[in-house]
Protein backbone atom coordinates (compact mmCIF):
# COMPACT_ATOMS: atom_id res chain seq x y z
CA UNK A 1 0.00 0.00 0.00
CA UNK A 2 1.13 3.55 -0.69
CA UNK A 3 0.08 6.97 0.51
CA UNK A 4 1.16 10.58 0.17
CA UNK A 5 3.60 10.07 3.05
CA UNK A 6 5.27 7.07 1.46
CA UNK A 7 5.94 9.00 -1.77
CA UNK A 8 7.91 11.74 -0.04
CA UNK A 9 11.20 11.01 -1.80
CA UNK A 10 9.46 11.10 -5.17
CA UNK A 11 7.76 14.37 -4.26
CA UNK A 12 11.09 15.92 -3.31
CA UNK A 13 12.70 14.65 -6.50
CA UNK A 14 9.85 16.11 -8.53
CA UNK A 15 10.31 19.53 -6.94
CA UNK A 16 13.98 19.44 -7.89
CA UNK A 17 13.29 18.05 -11.36
CA UNK A 18 10.87 20.88 -12.17
CA UNK A 19 13.72 23.37 -11.82
CA UNK A 20 15.89 21.50 -14.32
CA UNK A 21 13.58 19.61 -16.68
CA UNK A 22 10.39 21.15 -18.17
CA UNK A 23 7.47 19.70 -16.24
CA UNK A 24 9.91 17.56 -14.27
CA UNK A 25 9.77 14.77 -16.86
CA UNK A 26 11.46 13.77 -20.12
CA UNK A 27 8.17 12.81 -21.82
CA UNK A 28 4.74 14.37 -21.11
CA UNK A 29 2.91 11.08 -20.54
CA UNK A 30 5.03 10.55 -17.40
CA UNK A 31 3.71 13.74 -15.80
CA UNK A 32 1.37 12.10 -13.29
CA UNK A 33 -0.70 14.59 -11.26
CA UNK A 34 0.07 15.87 -8.68
CA UNK A 35 3.54 14.36 -9.19
CA UNK A 36 4.95 11.09 -10.53
CA UNK A 37 6.76 8.44 -8.58
CA UNK A 38 10.42 8.15 -9.53
CA UNK A 39 11.61 4.63 -10.29
CA UNK A 40 14.59 3.09 -8.53
CA UNK A 41 14.52 -0.37 -10.15
CA UNK A 42 12.34 -2.91 -11.94
CA UNK A 43 12.40 -6.66 -12.28
CA UNK A 44 9.96 -9.07 -13.91
CA UNK A 45 6.41 -7.77 -13.47
CA UNK A 46 7.36 -5.37 -10.65
CA UNK A 47 8.62 -1.80 -10.50
CA UNK A 48 9.96 -0.10 -7.35
CA UNK A 49 10.07 3.62 -6.53
CA UNK A 50 12.53 5.75 -4.56
CA UNK A 51 10.54 5.24 -1.37
CA UNK A 52 10.73 1.46 -1.69
CA UNK A 53 7.11 0.95 -2.78
CA UNK A 54 6.69 -1.94 -5.20
CA UNK A 55 3.97 -2.10 -7.85
CA UNK A 56 2.72 -4.72 -10.28
CA UNK A 57 3.43 -2.97 -13.56
CA UNK A 58 1.00 -2.91 -16.50
CA UNK A 59 2.59 0.13 -18.09
CA UNK A 60 5.73 -1.86 -18.98
CA UNK A 61 7.60 1.20 -20.29
CA UNK A 62 4.62 1.82 -22.61
CA UNK A 63 4.98 -1.48 -24.39
CA UNK A 64 8.57 -2.66 -24.94
CA UNK A 65 8.81 -5.04 -21.96
CA UNK A 66 6.92 -8.01 -23.40
CA UNK A 67 9.15 -10.35 -21.37
CA UNK A 68 8.97 -8.17 -18.26
CA UNK A 69 11.67 -5.95 -16.80
CA UNK A 70 15.35 -6.82 -16.54
CA UNK A 71 15.00 -10.13 -18.37
CA UNK A 72 18.20 -12.19 -17.96
CA UNK A 73 18.45 -13.22 -21.62
CA UNK A 74 18.34 -9.61 -22.80
CA UNK A 75 20.63 -8.45 -20.01
CA UNK A 76 23.28 -11.04 -20.88
CA UNK A 77 23.17 -10.08 -24.55
CA UNK A 78 23.73 -6.42 -23.67
CA UNK A 79 26.58 -7.28 -21.30
CA UNK A 80 28.26 -9.42 -23.94
CA UNK A 81 28.07 -6.59 -26.46
CA UNK A 82 29.39 -4.03 -23.97
CA UNK A 83 32.54 -6.10 -23.65
CA UNK A 84 33.08 -5.65 -27.40
CA UNK A 85 32.20 -1.94 -27.51
CA UNK A 86 28.92 -0.09 -27.77
CA UNK A 87 29.27 2.34 -30.69
CA UNK A 88 31.41 1.99 -33.80
CA UNK A 89 30.10 4.23 -36.55
CA UNK A 90 30.44 1.30 -38.97
CA UNK A 91 28.11 -1.44 -40.20
CA UNK A 92 27.97 -4.63 -38.14
CA UNK A 93 27.06 -8.25 -38.76
CA UNK A 94 24.48 -7.86 -35.99
CA UNK A 95 22.44 -5.45 -38.14
CA UNK A 96 22.29 -7.92 -41.01
CA UNK A 97 21.26 -10.75 -38.69
CA UNK A 98 18.45 -8.79 -37.04
CA UNK A 99 17.24 -7.42 -40.37
CA UNK A 100 17.00 -10.98 -41.71
CA UNK A 101 15.01 -12.10 -38.67
CA UNK A 102 12.54 -9.22 -38.91
CA UNK A 103 12.01 -9.61 -42.65
CA UNK A 104 11.27 -13.29 -42.10
CA UNK A 105 8.20 -12.42 -40.05
CA UNK A 106 6.88 -9.43 -42.02
CA UNK A 107 5.99 -10.16 -45.66
CA UNK A 108 5.66 -6.41 -46.22
CA UNK A 109 9.40 -6.01 -45.57
CA UNK A 110 11.90 -6.88 -48.30
CA UNK A 111 14.42 -4.38 -46.96
CA UNK A 112 14.62 -2.22 -43.84
CA UNK A 113 16.61 0.54 -42.18
CA UNK A 114 17.38 0.82 -38.47
CA UNK A 115 16.91 4.12 -36.64
CA UNK A 116 16.89 5.04 -32.96
CA UNK A 117 13.23 5.74 -32.13
CA UNK A 118 9.69 5.07 -33.25
CA UNK A 119 9.39 8.76 -34.08
CA UNK A 120 12.30 8.49 -36.49
CA UNK A 121 10.79 5.39 -38.06
CA UNK A 122 7.50 7.05 -38.99
CA UNK A 123 9.17 10.33 -39.96
CA UNK A 124 11.51 8.48 -42.31
CA UNK A 125 8.75 6.25 -43.68
CA UNK A 126 6.62 9.25 -44.61
CA UNK A 127 9.57 11.06 -46.21
CA UNK A 128 10.33 7.93 -48.21
CA UNK A 129 6.69 7.52 -49.26
CA UNK A 130 6.67 11.08 -50.55
CA UNK A 131 9.98 10.62 -52.33
CA UNK A 132 8.90 7.36 -53.94
CA UNK A 133 5.52 8.61 -55.16
CA UNK A 134 6.44 12.22 -55.89
CA UNK A 135 3.35 13.34 -53.94
CA UNK A 136 3.18 15.40 -50.76
CA UNK A 137 -0.08 14.64 -48.97
CA UNK A 138 -0.73 11.77 -46.62
CA UNK A 139 -3.65 10.62 -44.48
CA UNK A 140 -3.38 9.79 -40.80
CA UNK A 141 -6.11 8.59 -38.48
CA UNK A 142 -7.66 10.99 -35.97
CA UNK A 143 -6.16 10.04 -32.62
CA UNK A 144 -3.43 7.97 -34.22
CA UNK A 145 -0.04 8.55 -32.64
CA UNK A 146 3.05 8.30 -34.81
CA UNK A 147 5.63 10.02 -32.64
CA UNK A 148 6.59 13.63 -32.10
CA UNK A 149 7.58 14.98 -35.52
CA UNK A 150 5.81 17.94 -37.08
CA UNK A 151 3.84 16.17 -39.80
CA UNK A 152 1.88 13.93 -37.43
CA UNK A 153 1.16 16.17 -34.43
CA UNK A 154 -2.39 16.86 -35.57
CA UNK A 155 -5.18 15.33 -33.47
CA UNK A 156 -2.54 13.03 -32.05
CA UNK A 157 -3.21 10.49 -29.33
CA UNK A 158 -0.98 9.61 -26.36
CA UNK A 159 0.15 12.39 -24.03
CA UNK A 160 -1.02 15.08 -26.43
CA UNK A 161 -4.68 14.13 -26.01
CA UNK A 162 -4.22 13.46 -22.29
CA UNK A 163 -3.05 17.04 -21.84
CA UNK A 164 -5.93 18.34 -23.95
CA UNK A 165 -3.51 19.60 -26.63
CA UNK A 166 -3.76 17.15 -29.55
CA UNK A 167 -2.12 19.71 -31.85
CA UNK A 168 1.19 21.46 -31.15
CA UNK A 169 2.35 25.05 -31.40
CA UNK A 170 5.53 25.63 -33.36
CA UNK A 171 4.38 23.81 -36.50
CA UNK A 172 3.77 26.04 -39.54
CA UNK A 173 0.27 25.78 -40.99
CA UNK A 174 1.80 25.53 -44.45
CA UNK A 175 3.45 22.30 -43.33
CA UNK A 176 0.41 20.56 -41.87
CA UNK A 177 -1.72 21.40 -44.90
CA UNK A 178 -0.31 18.19 -46.35
CA UNK A 179 -1.59 16.18 -43.38
CA UNK A 180 -5.12 14.91 -43.95
CA UNK A 181 -7.17 13.05 -41.37
CA UNK A 182 -9.86 10.42 -41.38
CA UNK A 183 -11.80 8.88 -38.49
CA UNK A 184 -10.79 5.35 -37.54
CA UNK A 185 -13.19 2.55 -38.48
CA UNK A 186 -14.98 4.73 -41.07
CA UNK A 187 -14.18 3.34 -44.50
CA UNK A 188 -16.68 5.65 -46.22
CA UNK A 189 -14.94 8.76 -44.91
CA UNK A 190 -11.56 7.31 -45.84
CA UNK A 191 -12.78 6.44 -49.33
CA UNK A 192 -13.98 9.98 -49.94
CA UNK A 193 -10.71 11.46 -48.75
CA UNK A 194 -8.56 9.09 -50.80
CA UNK A 195 -10.55 9.51 -54.00
CA UNK A 196 -10.63 13.31 -53.67
CA UNK A 197 -6.87 13.58 -53.15
CA UNK A 198 -5.46 10.53 -54.95
CA UNK A 199 -3.34 12.53 -57.43
CA UNK A 200 -1.57 14.30 -54.55
CA UNK A 201 -1.65 11.47 -52.01
CA UNK A 202 1.53 9.58 -51.13
CA UNK A 203 0.31 7.32 -48.34
CA UNK A 204 -2.12 6.38 -45.63
CA UNK A 205 -0.39 5.74 -42.29
CA UNK A 206 -2.30 3.88 -39.60
CA UNK A 207 -1.86 2.07 -36.33
CA UNK A 208 -3.79 -1.15 -37.08
CA UNK A 209 -4.89 -1.05 -33.43
CA UNK A 210 -5.04 2.48 -32.01
CA UNK A 211 -2.74 2.01 -29.04
CA UNK A 212 -2.60 5.57 -27.74
CA UNK A 213 -6.29 6.39 -27.58
CA UNK A 214 -7.83 3.26 -26.09
CA UNK A 215 -6.79 0.72 -27.30
CA UNK A 216 -9.35 0.80 -30.08
CA UNK A 217 -9.59 -2.25 -32.32
CA UNK A 218 -10.61 -2.36 -35.99
CA UNK A 219 -14.19 -3.24 -36.83
CA UNK A 220 -14.59 -6.39 -38.97
CA UNK A 221 -13.56 -5.71 -42.55
CA UNK A 222 -12.13 -2.23 -41.93
CA UNK A 223 -8.45 -3.03 -42.50
CA UNK A 224 -9.28 -5.30 -45.44
CA UNK A 225 -11.29 -2.54 -47.12
CA UNK A 226 -8.54 -0.01 -46.41
CA UNK A 227 -5.96 -2.26 -48.08
CA UNK A 228 -8.24 -2.69 -51.10
CA UNK A 229 -8.86 1.07 -51.30
CA UNK A 230 -5.19 2.01 -51.25
CA UNK A 231 -4.31 -0.57 -53.89
CA UNK A 232 -7.10 0.58 -56.20
CA UNK A 233 -5.95 4.20 -55.91
CA UNK A 234 -2.19 3.59 -56.11
CA UNK A 235 -1.60 4.97 -52.61
CA UNK A 236 0.96 3.43 -50.26
CA UNK A 237 -0.35 1.86 -47.05
CA UNK A 238 1.95 2.20 -44.04
CA UNK A 239 1.28 0.14 -40.93
CA UNK A 240 2.71 1.79 -37.82
CA UNK A 241 3.43 -1.30 -35.73
CA UNK A 242 5.66 0.35 -33.15
CA UNK A 243 3.25 -0.97 -30.49
CA UNK A 244 1.68 -4.01 -32.17
CA UNK A 245 4.83 -5.34 -33.81
CA UNK A 246 5.92 -8.60 -32.14
CA UNK A 247 3.18 -8.07 -29.53
CA UNK A 248 0.00 -9.37 -31.14
CA UNK A 249 2.04 -12.09 -32.84
CA UNK A 250 5.56 -12.55 -34.17
CA UNK A 251 4.31 -10.97 -37.38
CA UNK A 252 2.44 -8.25 -35.50
CA UNK A 253 -0.94 -6.99 -36.65
CA UNK A 254 -0.10 -8.07 -40.19
CA UNK A 255 -0.04 -11.70 -39.12
CA UNK A 256 -2.92 -11.28 -36.65
CA UNK A 257 -5.31 -9.72 -39.19
CA UNK A 258 -3.83 -11.16 -42.39
CA UNK A 259 -3.14 -7.80 -44.07
CA UNK A 260 0.07 -6.94 -45.96
CA UNK A 261 0.81 -3.19 -46.23
CA UNK A 262 3.41 -1.56 -48.48
CA UNK A 263 5.56 -0.27 -45.61
CA UNK A 264 5.93 -1.02 -41.91
CA UNK A 265 7.38 0.80 -38.92
CA UNK A 266 8.52 -1.01 -35.78
CA UNK A 267 10.04 -0.16 -32.40
CA UNK A 268 9.62 -0.91 -28.69
CA UNK A 269 9.71 -4.75 -28.39
CA UNK A 270 12.13 -5.23 -31.30
CA UNK A 271 14.86 -3.45 -29.31
CA UNK A 272 14.38 -5.47 -26.15
CA UNK A 273 13.83 -2.25 -24.19
CA UNK A 274 16.73 -0.29 -25.68
CA UNK A 275 16.23 2.64 -28.08
CA UNK A 276 15.40 1.46 -31.59
CA UNK A 277 13.19 2.09 -34.57
CA UNK A 278 12.74 0.25 -37.86
CA UNK A 279 11.12 1.18 -41.13
CA UNK A 280 10.89 -1.22 -44.02
CA UNK A 281 8.95 -2.11 -47.11
CA UNK A 282 9.02 -3.35 -50.64
CA UNK A 283 12.42 -3.42 -52.30
CA UNK A 284 11.59 -0.85 -54.97
CA UNK A 285 10.50 1.60 -52.28
CA UNK A 286 13.39 1.03 -49.88
CA UNK A 287 16.04 1.35 -52.59
CA UNK A 288 15.07 5.03 -52.82
CA UNK A 289 16.81 5.57 -49.45
CA UNK A 290 20.33 7.03 -49.50
CA UNK A 291 22.96 5.95 -50.38
CA UNK A 292 21.03 3.74 -52.83
CA UNK A 293 18.66 6.54 -53.81
CA UNK A 294 17.85 10.24 -53.42
CA UNK A 295 15.75 10.16 -50.20
CA UNK A 296 18.08 11.12 -47.36
CA UNK A 297 18.11 9.45 -43.95
CA UNK A 298 20.96 9.13 -41.45
CA UNK A 299 21.74 8.84 -37.75
CA UNK A 300 24.80 8.52 -35.52
CA UNK A 301 23.11 5.94 -33.29
CA UNK A 302 21.20 4.07 -36.01
CA UNK A 303 21.92 0.36 -35.68
CA UNK A 304 23.39 0.84 -32.19
CA UNK A 305 25.17 -2.46 -31.39
CA UNK A 306 23.63 -2.84 -27.93
CA UNK A 307 20.11 -2.23 -29.20
CA UNK A 308 20.61 -4.65 -32.07
CA UNK A 309 22.09 -7.30 -29.76
CA UNK A 310 19.12 -6.90 -27.41
CA UNK A 311 16.75 -7.18 -30.36
CA UNK A 312 18.32 -10.42 -31.55
CA UNK A 313 18.15 -11.82 -28.02
CA UNK A 314 14.47 -11.02 -27.56
CA UNK A 315 13.47 -12.38 -30.98
CA UNK A 316 15.50 -15.55 -30.41
CA UNK A 317 13.73 -16.00 -27.08
CA UNK A 318 10.30 -15.40 -28.59
CA UNK A 319 11.05 -17.90 -31.34
CA UNK A 320 12.21 -20.56 -28.90
CA UNK A 321 9.63 -20.11 -26.14
CA UNK A 322 6.64 -19.29 -28.37
CA UNK A 323 5.10 -17.16 -25.63
CA UNK A 324 2.44 -15.28 -27.60
CA UNK A 325 -0.38 -17.77 -27.08
CA UNK A 326 0.25 -17.80 -23.33
CA UNK A 327 0.63 -14.03 -22.96
CA UNK A 328 -2.37 -13.31 -25.17
CA UNK A 329 -4.46 -15.75 -23.12
CA UNK A 330 -3.60 -13.71 -20.02
CA UNK A 331 -5.00 -10.67 -21.79
CA UNK A 332 -8.12 -12.58 -22.79
CA UNK A 333 -8.65 -13.71 -19.20
CA UNK A 334 -8.17 -10.23 -17.74
CA UNK A 335 -10.63 -8.68 -20.20
CA UNK A 336 -13.21 -11.39 -19.51
CA UNK A 337 -13.04 -10.91 -15.74
CA UNK A 338 -13.03 -7.11 -16.03
CA UNK A 339 -16.15 -7.34 -18.18
CA UNK A 340 -17.84 -9.37 -15.43
CA UNK A 341 -16.74 -6.83 -12.80
CA UNK A 342 -18.14 -3.91 -14.79
CA UNK A 343 -21.42 -5.73 -15.39
CA UNK A 344 -21.74 -6.78 -11.75
CA UNK A 345 -21.11 -3.22 -10.59
CA UNK A 346 -23.65 -1.88 -13.07
CA UNK A 347 -21.37 0.96 -14.14
CA UNK A 348 -21.25 2.56 -17.57
CA UNK A 349 -17.69 1.57 -18.35
CA UNK A 350 -16.36 -0.61 -21.16
CA UNK A 351 -13.53 -3.09 -21.47
CA UNK A 352 -11.32 -2.69 -24.53
CA UNK A 353 -8.31 -4.44 -25.96
CA UNK A 354 -6.86 -7.30 -27.94
CA UNK A 355 -4.27 -10.01 -27.32
CA UNK A 356 -2.03 -8.78 -24.46
CA UNK A 357 -3.45 -5.23 -24.52
CA UNK A 358 -6.36 -4.20 -22.29
CA UNK A 359 -8.09 -1.20 -20.72
CA UNK A 360 -11.21 -0.20 -18.84
CA UNK A 361 -12.64 2.82 -20.58
CA UNK A 362 -14.55 5.25 -18.39
CA UNK A 363 -17.43 5.52 -20.84
CA UNK A 364 -18.99 3.63 -23.73
CA UNK A 365 -16.65 1.53 -25.86
CA UNK A 366 -15.05 3.86 -28.41
CA UNK A 367 -14.58 3.00 -32.08
CA UNK A 368 -12.81 6.23 -33.02
CA UNK A 369 -11.13 9.34 -31.63
CA UNK A 370 -14.24 11.48 -31.22
CA UNK A 371 -15.99 8.75 -29.23
CA UNK A 372 -12.90 8.28 -27.05
CA UNK A 373 -12.89 11.96 -26.13
CA UNK A 374 -16.27 11.53 -24.39
CA UNK A 375 -14.70 9.47 -21.60
CA UNK A 376 -14.41 10.59 -17.98
CA UNK A 377 -10.71 11.53 -17.83
CA UNK A 378 -10.86 12.89 -14.29
CA UNK A 379 -12.69 9.80 -13.09
CA UNK A 380 -9.99 7.62 -14.60
CA UNK A 381 -7.22 9.67 -12.97
CA UNK A 382 -8.82 9.24 -9.55
CA UNK A 383 -9.10 5.51 -10.23
CA UNK A 384 -5.44 5.40 -11.29
CA UNK A 385 -4.40 6.80 -7.90
CA UNK A 386 -6.57 4.30 -6.04
CA UNK A 387 -4.95 1.47 -7.97
CA UNK A 388 -1.49 2.88 -7.32
CA UNK A 389 -2.29 2.95 -3.60
CA UNK A 390 -3.22 -0.73 -3.96
CA UNK A 391 0.15 -1.54 -5.49
CA UNK A 392 -0.95 -1.64 -9.13
CA UNK A 393 0.76 0.64 -11.67
CA UNK A 394 -1.41 1.37 -14.70
CA UNK A 395 -0.68 4.03 -17.33
CA UNK A 396 -1.80 7.34 -15.78
CA UNK A 397 -3.69 8.35 -18.92
CA UNK A 398 -7.11 7.03 -19.88
CA UNK A 399 -5.82 6.90 -23.43
CA UNK A 400 -2.75 4.72 -22.90
CA UNK A 401 -2.91 0.94 -23.18
CA UNK A 402 -2.31 -1.53 -20.35
CA UNK A 403 0.06 -4.33 -21.32
CA UNK A 404 0.50 -7.86 -19.99
CA UNK A 405 3.93 -9.49 -20.06
CA UNK A 406 5.30 -13.01 -19.92
CA UNK A 407 6.49 -12.16 -16.40
CA UNK A 408 3.02 -11.55 -14.94
CA UNK A 409 2.13 -14.50 -12.73
CA UNK A 410 -1.29 -15.87 -11.90
CA UNK A 411 -0.86 -14.35 -8.44
CA UNK A 412 -0.09 -10.94 -9.99
CA UNK A 413 -3.19 -11.10 -12.14
CA UNK A 414 -5.53 -12.22 -9.37
CA UNK A 415 -4.22 -9.48 -7.07
CA UNK A 416 -4.78 -6.99 -9.86
CA UNK A 417 -8.34 -8.11 -10.53
CA UNK A 418 -9.10 -7.92 -6.81
CA UNK A 419 -7.83 -4.34 -6.82
CA UNK A 420 -10.06 -3.51 -9.79
CA UNK A 421 -13.06 -4.88 -7.90
CA UNK A 422 -12.23 -2.80 -4.83
CA UNK A 423 -11.36 0.43 -6.62
CA UNK A 424 -13.84 0.85 -9.46
Curated annotation (Swiss-Prot):
Assigned keywords, A-Z: Cytoplasm, Isomerase, Porphyrin biosynthesis, Pyridoxal phosphate
Predominant location category: cytoplasm
Pfam families found in the cross-reference section: Aminotran_3
Compartments, record wording: Cytoplasm
Broad class of enzyme this protein falls into: isomerase
Modified residues (N6-(pyridoxal phosphate)lysine): 268
Catalytic activity: (S)-4-amino-5-oxopentanoate = 5-aminolevulinate
UniProt-listed PROSITE patterns: AA_TRANSFER_CLASS_3
Gene Ontology molecular function: any one: transaminase activity
EC number, as in UniProt: 5.4.3.8
One GO CC annotation: cytoplasm
CDD domains: OAT_like
Family: Belongs to the class-III pyridoxal-phosphate-dependent aminotransferase family. HemL subfamily.
Name of protein: Glutamate-1-semialdehyde 2,1-aminomutase
Biological source species: Methanosarcina barkeri (strain Fusaro / DSM 804)
